[in-house]
């Protein structure tokens, strides 16, 4: 394979293997039943319908590998990817790499059988509702998956007001067990008559800033959205989003008006160069990894129009 520019979203150990990164929100079910689920997952009685099969996924992702080489596939979204192990098998067999966002409710042995732990990292999220607020039970399963060979870069948590008083304790427990943590504020949610993240009080903001990962402006500055100071973005150039139905979008915040669909035998139409972004705010988890040119806030409109 010819050399290509390293993708900032791909872990260092795979930068020479995966030119492109994609996020695929294929999951359509979750058993966690968290009362605070913003997507209504607590009310799901069965998986959401889909028009494609696991076999379709196997064929499609095999074709995408032949067109793009092995890709870094983020198995994420609002529901639980491990509820559809057949899709994870398809991605692994097709020869891709990536990560799986998970609540760890799947049996560790089943997950290790579905995907190659050497190809897929785990991005687990600790949901206190599922584990009755007990980090040790979650850690037991986490350690089993680590023993299976999975790389676990961090354990994520959301700073829900109901659980805020225990956040520092849980972070300490995970760090003591050898895991980095990624605490994120609630975003665009209401609880007990308050709007979050705007209504975190000053004391909570001090705690949050102490727990959130440092060194990246999306984490240290973006408790609330901040105006973009970006001239161009690599979304659509070396990264894209794919919906559950298979529609290909430049990014989840600004969908394409006429997206391709991977299940219609369409190729992903990568942009030749990073493109300007006309949004006032960016809510992408990859902020500042995808954005390639930073400009002064006052120059943003000119940069977009250029």
What residue spans do the PLM features occupy?
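Short, well-ordered alpha-helical microsegments
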Residues: 82-86, 106-110, 164-167, 249
């Amino acid at each position: 394979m010819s050399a290509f520019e390293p993708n900032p979203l791909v872990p260092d150990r795979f930068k020479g293997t995966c030119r492109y990164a994609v996020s695929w929100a294929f999951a359509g079910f979750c058993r966690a039943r968290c009362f605070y689920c913003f997507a209504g997952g607590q009310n799901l009685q069965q998986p959401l319908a889909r028009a494609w099969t696991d076999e379709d996924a196997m064929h499609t992702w095999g074709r995408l590998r032949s067109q793009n080489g092995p890709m870094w596939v983020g198995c994420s979204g609002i529901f639980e990817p491990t509820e559809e192990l057949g899709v994870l098998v398809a991605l692994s067999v097709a020869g891709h790499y990536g990560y799986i966002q998970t609540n760890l409710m799947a049996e560790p042995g089943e997950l290790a059988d579905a995907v190659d732990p050497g190809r897929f990292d785990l991005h687990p999220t600790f949901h206190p509702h599922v584990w009755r607020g007990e980090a040790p039970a979650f850690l037991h399963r986490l350690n089993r998956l680590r023993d299976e060979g999975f790389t676990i870069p961090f354990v994520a948590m959301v700073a829900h007001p109901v659980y805020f008083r225990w956040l520092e304790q849980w972070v300490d427990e995970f760090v003591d067990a050898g895991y980095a943590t990624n605490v994120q504020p609630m975003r665009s949610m209401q609880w007990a008559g308050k709007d979050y993240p705007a209504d975190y009080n000053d004391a909570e903001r001090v705690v949050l800033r102490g727990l959130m990962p440092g060194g990246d402006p999306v984490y240290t500055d973006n408790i609330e959205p901040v105006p973009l100071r970006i001239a161009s973005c690599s979304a659509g150039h070396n990264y894209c989003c794919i919906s559950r139905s298979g529609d290909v979008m430049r990014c989840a915040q600004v969908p394409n008006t006429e997206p391709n669909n991977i299940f219609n035998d369409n190729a992903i139409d990568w942009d030749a160069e990073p493109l300007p972004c006309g949004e006032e705010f960016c809510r992408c988890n990859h902020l500042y990894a995808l954005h390639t040119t930073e400009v002064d806030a006052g120059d943003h409109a000119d940069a977009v129009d250029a």
